[in-house]
Curated annotation (Swiss-Prot):
InterPro entries: Glyco_hydro_17, Glyco_hydro_17_plant, Glycoside_hydrolase_SF. It comes from Hordeum vulgare. This is Lichenase-2. Transmembrane segments: none annotated. Keywords: Glycoprotein, Glycosidase, Hydrolase, Signal. It holds the Pfam family Glyco_hydro_17. PANTHER family: GLUCAN ENDO-1,3-BETA-GLUCOSIDASE BG1-RELATED-RELATED. It is an enzyme of class 3 (hydrolase).
Amino acid sequence: PPSVESIGVCYGMSANNLPAASTVVSMFKFNGIKSMRLYAPNQAALQAVGGTGINVVVGAPNDVLSNLAASPAAAASWVKSNIQAYPKVSFRYVCVGNEVAGGATRNLVPAMKNVHGALVAAGLGHIKVTTSVSQAILGVFSPPSAGSFTGEAAAFMGPVVQFLARTNAPLMANIYPYLAWAYNPSAMDMGYALFNASGTVVRDGAYGYQNLFDTTVDAFYTAMGKHGGSSVKLVVSESGWPSGGGTAATPANARFYNQHLINHVGRGTPRHPGAIETYIFAMFNENQKDSGVEQNWGLFYPNMQHVYPINF
């Protein structure tokens, strides 16, 4: 795959007031953001990002999974329309489904296999096929050495992890210390979620953990290892902190978290040193998300002003 900077940004589009895609791509370039996550193959965005050298993660949305799982021909058609049609785009991954849950999980591995087969047949096997999971699939996340999937998640994650190991692809996970903390603020010091703890909070054998981000990443590694995925890398497909709409959701806290995230991911975790490929959620505040914190994850307002200053 193309070389990657450790930090990208998720370009979500659940809003009716965003700038044109070509303008957004210019904002990525101006701010030195080298990687972009798209949740679906948006034509305007893919046309605009072609030839820029920006690495792209493109989603095959949840509503196409059953179709992609049902037939290799459907997957080949999807790849032709959404990948091969954009030869100038530096595609890095196709992310098949985002936080797929319930009965739909039965389509995950068949869809991933069919998309992978279609990419290989098109001479595009360097574009890896993965899926993006929620941190909620971890039944145990602390200490990281005890990390494991919930019983329900283990049933579908075993085959997912084994497919990723076979194809040398990473698992993508959406990791939100804010949400874990806000769910039960009395159970955890906010500094541990915010990259602001003064020392080791969780001691795990020889390893000391100062922040919940590292704890969660390493718990995912332990959980994957229990299902034949000890060779699989983790990519953080979303992380961030909201600037409004909820408890401790302020521009100052959001800036503190995201700036520390950017500065931190180049170093890795206690158990897995080295850069962690990470995508900040999100480029913009999105006004068609649920009210509250969901509308307030953006680095920018739709008018292109910074919600708070940040340095990539």
